[in-house]
Amino acid sequence: PLHLHEISAQDEPRIDMHDAELNRVLGGGLVPGSIVLLGGEPGIGKSTLTLQTILHMDNRRVLYVSGEESTHQIKMRAERIGGNSEVMILCETSLEDIFDNIKEVKPELVVIDSIQTISTSDVERSPGSITQVRECAAALLRFAKTSGIPVILIGHINKEGTLAGPKLLEHIVDTVIQFEGDQHYMYRILRSIKNRFGSTSELGI
């Protein structure tokens, strides 16, 4: 253990997300080793927002893990958006295989789209179940804290308005950002509802 006076109070450098609104909602950028949950209703644009963000991070080695779309589908969306073609795409739902790929490519940021599609062989439940979601999120949290590599989890809000099965994920992750809006309006809102490293009073449009 360290004595309190031995610990530097200097803020750890944050990762620039190349999106002023997202940076502000995060509290000034993404904290290394943190785990962020981006939640919202299915179809509101969580995947597009995240893909758009990482495609503009030219100086970062990013691994985008999709359990919902094929590489071809992601490629088509990425071409429409434009940006960093060096982003690595992995279509996988096994948490163990995801970790094997992470060890191989050594990314600086990992995106999981979505946490409801990922499963671990340690749990005898189907993907998307409360037990699977909780165990996978906890394993990804341990990975982020020990490696210093930040993880962004995309999670769907159900009809009751909760993230990925009651509020179980909100207690595990460092930051929860809710992506809100209406299909009839042009603008969407990013709302921070939990942030260990910043304010929860910030909104992004």
List PLM regions with ranges.
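Conserved nucleotide-binding/hydrolysis micro-motifs of P-loop NTPases
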Residues: 42-44, 68-72, 80-83, 93-97, ...
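Conserved P-loop NTPase
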Residues: 1-4, 104-107, 116, 172, ...
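Loop/turn-to-beta-strand initiation segments
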Residues: 61, 85-86, 106-109, 146-153
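Flexible beta-alpha connector loops of hexameric P-loop NTPases
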Residues: 11-14, 39, 63, 83-92, ...
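The Walker A/P-loop phosphate-binding site
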Residues: 1-84, 99, 103
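Short regulatory helix/loop adjacent to the ATP-binding pocket of P-loop NTPases
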Residues: 78, 162-172
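Conserved P-loop NTPase "ATPase switch" module shared by AAA+ and STAND
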Residues: 105-125
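Substrate-engagement module of ASCE P-loop NTPases
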Residues: 131-152, 156, 172-183
